């Protein structure tokens, strides 16, 4: 809030899709100018949808068929819904999301799906390499570790979201500051000079950032903003 009072624009830049960001009460309580969602594929600024990119229909069946062929647990992520593969048992992570969002869940097999990206979990039978190859015409693979994978359309990333907004507001990248903590933040941490890693972030990212702040629970974001004189 102090950052915005001082005339700066504040955005959430998330891999999550729109509903999974704006329906989090703690995010709304803080207050942001906008949201870069779905790894750059959906950008909302003060209620205006500046960019909405969804997976082309010709890729829908290819993703679902490949997930079943190579035994990957699949979750399609859209601006309004999660799409669950109900043909296989759910692991704890998928079940938790299914239970948390009863008004935002659909079956992957319904027609006319609308999604921006997807994630997968490996199973004991998974052939991850073959799955990644099968969907590679459309998607970039981010290995999140622990058998969890994130797949974003080639033309979009957290970095492209930053560039879109910089162009929109006539800013240079030197005017942009980014704070991240995990591997799906790597594109934006590499893209912007003033890149900041949370103290509790993935250790391998330390070599990719300009500054490492304190842990999230030790006022890491506030301390980073103070370090760069963005707030007093």
Over which residues does each language-model region extend?
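Active-site phosphate-binding/coordination module
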Residues: 1-90
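Short active-site oxyanion
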Residues: 7-11, 31-33, 116-118, 174-175, ...
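Hydrophobic/aromatic beta-strand patches that form the interior of the parallel beta-sheet core
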Residues: 11, 36, 177-179, 196, ...
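Hydrophobic residues within well-ordered alpha-helices
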Residues: 3, 39, 162, 188-192
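Phosphate- and divalent-cation-binding pockets in alpha/beta enzyme and binding domains
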Residues: 20-23, 130, 161, 187-188, ...
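Short, structured coil segments at secondary-structure junctions
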Residues: 28-31, 39, 134-138, 191-192, ...
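Asp-based, Mg2+/Mn2+-dependent phosphohydrolase catalytic module
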Residues: 191, 195, 199-232
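Conserved acidic, metal-coordinating active-site core of Asp-based
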Residues: 66-188, 200
